[in-house]
Every structure is written in structure tokens, then in C-alpha cells.
Amino acid sequence: VHENFKKDSAALGASLMRSGMAQAGATYCHGPTRLPLLRKNPRGHAEFLRQFCEHSAQGSGLTSIGYQGRRPSLYKLQTEIAHIAVPTFIMVGDADEPCLDPSLMLKRTIPHSQLAVLPDSGHGINLEEPELFNRLLGDFLATHG
């Protein structure tokens, strides 16, 4: 799985630098993990796309290639992650397919962790469900902050 992520990160980075942010945004910002935001909040999605397109194509491309694609897999860091001693709150959208399994792994690995799976939500849960996101986070911080 991580090898595919590396390849995808390299391809995205090359595409960003070759075609620019507007072209990349037309596909990346309309991918399956971003569609719930478009459906729930078209104006919010348009703003997300606008801000995405304002980023530097070279900077975003190099970040995708040089950082995203090269960072170690969370699965390879499980031993270190298991030593996290502070309460940890993990949130994920149920339509954010690439993040579901890693989120569950984090929940199982971090001793004092909680996992919230937001229904009918993608990768932008704070933009898609701001009230629910803020309430859940606020409750966690009130208990553990």
C-alpha cells in the first residue's frame, strides 16, 4: 500500500509542476474524498478549490514528491506510536477511504486514544461538518485538555 502512495505522491507532484494548480485542482479537489464537501457545501468547496489553486505549483509539487512520498508509513511507526502517552483524538470521515484503515490502526495502537468516524463525510470533515467536528473536539478537549 505504501509503495502505491509513494507512486501516487510522485505522480501528483509531477502533475502539479507540469500542469499547474488549476488543472490539478480540477481532478484532486473533485476526487472521491472531496465529493462530500461539494455535495454538502458547494460554496465551501468552491472556496477550498480557490485556495488550493492559489498555492505554488512548484512548492506543492515538491512537497508531494519530497515529503509526502518519502515520509515513512504510519504502519512502520507503530512501535513508536504505541508510546504516545497523551490522550489522542482521531477523527475521520467514513467516505475518506484512504484514511479509514490508518485511523483504526492509530486507535488500536495509541493507548489513550479515541476514534470518531463522521458519517457521510470525506477528507475535509472540519469543513463538511463544522458544528459536529467542533463539538466532538470541544468535548474531547474539555475532558482531556
PLM regions: where:
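Flexible "cap/lid" loop of the alpha/beta hydrolase fold
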Residues: 1-28
